[in-house]
Regions:
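Short acidic-hydrophobic, aromatic-tinged amphipathic segments that line or gate anion-handling sites
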Residues: 98-101, 189-190, 250-258
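Conserved nucleotide-sugar donor-interacting segment of glycosyltransferase catalytic cores
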Residues: 2-66
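A short helix->loop->beta-strand "cap" motif at the edges of active sites that frequently abuts
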Residues: 32-37, 69, 94-95, 158, ...
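A nucleotide-sugar donor-handling region in carbohydrate enzymes
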Residues: 42-139, 165
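Donor-nucleotide binding loops and adjacent catalytic segments primarily
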Residues: 104-204, 255
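C-terminal amphipathic helix plus adjacent low-complexity
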Residues: 264-313
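A donor-sugar binding/catalytic signature common to diverse glycosyltransferases
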Residues: 193-238
């Protein structure tokens, strides 16, 4: 901070850092670089209201957000989850909080046709993408999916790509690979930097409920069955529940996850009509709004105003 002397300091999720490590930096900048502007960036949902309120009171986050930050930006929509009301923001904190909408994910690097050709998928085949995020706790979802395919879709050739995640424990990965490899229409990737391309090519996505994955699903207007994580925080569960109530995806509670139940919901989604733009009323304008908000904040700084002046050519 002393070296960079930032004009704007953007902090993600926790006002003083993951383990309080930003407190000293915030204190330093306050006294040695008072012109720095501060923005706290929050996801649409942090945790349940009782858990979040208790944590913010315990960690003094309300005071920090009110006293140290110029603005709070929430990358979500109040129609889905009104964090300002749910988390009981004070009038002072409400006044500096803005909902930016959801982040529209960029398109993939490969066309759906190229992906389907790569995986040997014909026009008549159905293609399901399974993605349990990083994979650390994704074994149950993938295991149940494979059981559903074996028990309930044995008479159908459904092309499946499982992107297991680089954090899946080695023993669990080996267990899954031993079952996937003998089946010609089942495919495995541990990780891909181009998940959006595979998602765009899929007829259905089966996933957990993390912010990035759900944003990709909604950006691409894909039919999806989401099995959210319910612990240690309720973020994914609340997100999936609210979106399911809005009719933009299907949700299964992990305690209700069985091969038969998953197969039933997948069958219903595979036979439903494709998603169309009119099905979605979600706001996906976070990136342009954030860009505008950055410029508005920085235009107040003399050093930045000089950079914005037109250059004679």
């Amino acid at each position: 901070a002393a070296h960079f002397q930032p004009d704007l300091f953007l902090v993600d999720k926790k006002p003083n850092g993951l383990q309080g490590e930003l407190q000293a930096t915030l204190d330093y900048l306050k006294y040695h670089h008072p012109q720095t502007r501060y923005v706290l960036l929050l996801r649409d949902i942090l945790d349940s209201a009782p858990a979040t309120i208790a944590q913010w009171q315990r960690e003094n986050y309300y005071f920090l957000a009110e006293s140290r930050y110029d603005q709070v930006w929430i990358v979500g929509s109040p129609e889905i989850f009104n964090a300002v009301e749910e988390y009981r923001f004070s009038p002072t904190l409400k006044a500096k909080t803005q909902f930016m909408g959801y982040i529209r994910r960029p398109p993939g690097l490969q066309s759906p046709q190229a992906i389907r050709q790569k995986l040997g998928i014909t026009e008549k085949d159905r293609f399901i993408l399974v993605t349990p995020g990083g994979g650390k706790d994704g074994f149950c979802l993938v295991d149940t999916y494979l059981q559903a395919q074996t028990q309930c879709f044995s008479d159908q050739k459904i092309i499946s790509l499982i992107v297991g995640g680089s954090e899946m424990p080695l023993a669990q990965k080996h267990d899954l690979l031993a079952r996937i490899r003998p089946v010609s229409h089942w495919h495995w990737l541990e990780f891909t930097p181009d998940l959006a391309s595979y998602m765009a090519a899929a007829d259905l996505v089966v996933s957990m409920g993390g912010y990035n994955t759900v944003s990709e699903i909604l950006s691409l207007q894909k039919r999806a069955v989401v099995v959210p994580r319910i612990e240690p925080v309720a973020e994914q569960w609340i997100r999936a529940q609210r979106l399911a109530e809005g009719g933009v995806l299907r949700m299964l509670h992990p305690q209700q996850l069985t091969p038969q139940r998953l197969a039933t919901v997948m069958s219903e989604e595979l036979t439903a009509s494709p998603r169309v733009a009119s099905d979605y009323t979600l706001d996906f304008n976070a990136l342009p709004r954030i860009t505008e908000a950055f410029l508005r904040l920085l235009e107040q700084e003399d050093s930045f105003k000089e950079l914005l002046q037109p250059i004679a050519v």
